[in-house]
Amino acid sequence: MSYRELRNLCEMTRSLRYPRLMSIENFRTPNFQLVAELLEWIVKKFEPESNLDAHEVQTEADRVAFIKNAVLLMLQNSRIKMNPKKLYQADGHAVQELLPAMKILYQAKAEDPNTDNSPKWTQVKNKLSSKMQEVRITRQLSSQLPETGALLSELLSRQEFISQQHERAASRAVPLAEAEKVLQATVQNIAQETEQLSNKLNNVASDEAELDEKIERKKREYEQLQKRFAKLQSFRPQYMDEYERFEERLKKLYEVYVLNFRNLSYLRKVHDDLARSERQRQEELEKAMRMAVEKMRLEQEKKDAIGLHDDDGSDAPLVDRRQSVRKVYGNMMGGDASDDDEDDEDDEDDEIIRMDDNVAQHHKRELHRQEEDEERSEADYMVGITTAHVADDAKSDLSSGDDF
């Protein structure tokens, strides 16, 4: 470690725009966090997709794993060898390991940006592309190599058998008579095949003529059918007028049917409503009658109870006085006192009879009202029947004549 190395590292980081400001004094004492952040930044410059994170380093094991991964990535991507022990010290010795990578980055930035178009760079790119092409060809050949080797092995295994058969065939003497027979049979077969081919060609010509004739005949039939179809489309049958007339009549009959159906549905609904209202009136009338009778019964019981209470609760001297008074005035007025009692009883009977008459009159009024409602519903029903008769008359008028 020297002062020059520390100064060069600080200047390079400043020129490369390292996000943290560094000084020479930072490396006088061990500072692992600073070295880890600087190492992460350098690795990200060479490999942007690396997953190193200096902020997750907490323990000694994390430090060791971080240094190992960083050194391995630098070796794989830039062929730069670093000493992990010196990096772990995180002092001036770590600066010596970081300087080679920083120099590469600094030189890459210091180069002229127009050097990409120089002949030297073009030559390098051509060589690189040719090498890449060779690599692709090598990969293809390496994938074909096992298949070729297997095929070659199979052919070599059959070579011995084939060579034996070849030697046996070469050592055998072929008789001329037998060879002549084989050649004659081959010539005859070839002649037969030639004759068959010529016959097929002749048949093809005749078949072509027949097919042309069939095509012409089908065309004529097609044209005739087209003309006939056009005539049938333009022809109007005789029954169409009658059919249209019946169709119109059927529409009218359907309208009448729909009207009758709606009237019938309405009348059924009205009938159901009347029956329901009639039941409700009957129930209300019966309830009112029961309440009136119950009220009369309660009033009568109250009156009877009041009379009995007056009779039982009167004192004996009062009874004697009343009897004496009755005797005195009875002698003077005759039978008027008894007549008054009888008149009171008659009045009570008349009141009961009058209440019964009121209930009967109320019942008669309800019955009269019910009869009027029934007459009104019958009148509505007659109106519906009249409408239905009118619709039936219209139907009979429409259906008169030549109906279907």
Curated annotation (Swiss-Prot):
One Pfam match, given by its short name, reads Cluap1
What does the record list as GO biological process? chemosensory behavior; chemotaxis; cilium assembly; intraciliary transport; response to alkaline pH
Q: Where is the composition biased (Acidic residues)?
A: 337-351
The region called Disordered is annotated at 328-382
Q: What stretch or stretches form a coiled coil here? A: 176-306
Q: According to its UniProt record, where is this protein located?
A: Cell projection, Axon; Cell projection, Cilium; Cell projection, Dendrite
Of the GO CC terms on this record, one is: microtubule organizing center
- This protein's record includes keyword Coiled coil: yes
Q: Does the keyword Nucleotide-binding apply?
A: no
Q: Which family does it belong to?
A: Belongs to the CLUAP1 family.
- What biological function has been recorded for the protein in this entry? Component of the intraflagellar transport (IFT) complex B required for transport of proteins in the motile cilium. May be required for ciliary entrance and transport of specific ciliary cargo proteins such as che-3 which are related to motility. Required for sensory cilia biogenesis.
Task: Describe its assembly.
Answer: Component of the IFT complex B composed of at least che-2, che-13, dyf-1, dyf-3, dyf-6, dyf-11, dyf-13, ift-20, ift-74, ift-81, ifta-2, osm-1, osm-5 and osm-6.
What protein name applies here? Clusterin-associated protein 1 homolog
Q: Which gene encodes it?
A: dyf-3
